[in-house]
């Protein structure tokens, strides 16, 4: 079952570190958000494969929005 990776803050997508199909390990930076001039890394909560990225760099997000989906190994 796919795992939703959600935004922990309201802000802007500063940098996307992964692509669809990429294998990630626990703790890997997936997306960097910017909020109040701070960069907040969103990291993988498990080993797996990125199956969907829902935002582009510079997009605005709100706290709790699904940023991407990871299919756990």
Sequence positions of predicted segments:
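Short low-complexity stretches enriched in small and charged residues
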Residues: 1, 8, 18-26
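Short beta-strand-turn/beta-hairpin segments enriched in glycine/proline and small hydrophobics
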Residues: 1-12, 32-45, 72
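Short histidine-centered loop motifs in beta-beta connectors
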Residues: 15-19, 23, 52-55
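A structural signal for short beta-strand/turn segments enriched in small hydrophobics and glycine
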Residues: 21-30, 58-67
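Generic C-terminal helix-cap and adjacent flexible tail
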Residues: 25, 72-73
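Short alpha-helical linear motifs
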Residues: 51-52, 68-71
């Amino acid at each position: 079952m796919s795992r939703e990776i959600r935004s922990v803050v309201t802000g802007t997508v500063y940098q996307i570190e992964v692509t669809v199909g990429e294998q990630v390990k626990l703790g890997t930076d997936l997306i960097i958000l910017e909020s109040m001039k701070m960069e907040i890394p969103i990291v993988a909560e498990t080993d797996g494969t990125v199956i969907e990225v829902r935002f582009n760099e510079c997009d605005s997000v709100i706290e709790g929005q699904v940023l991407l989906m990871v299919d756990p190994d």
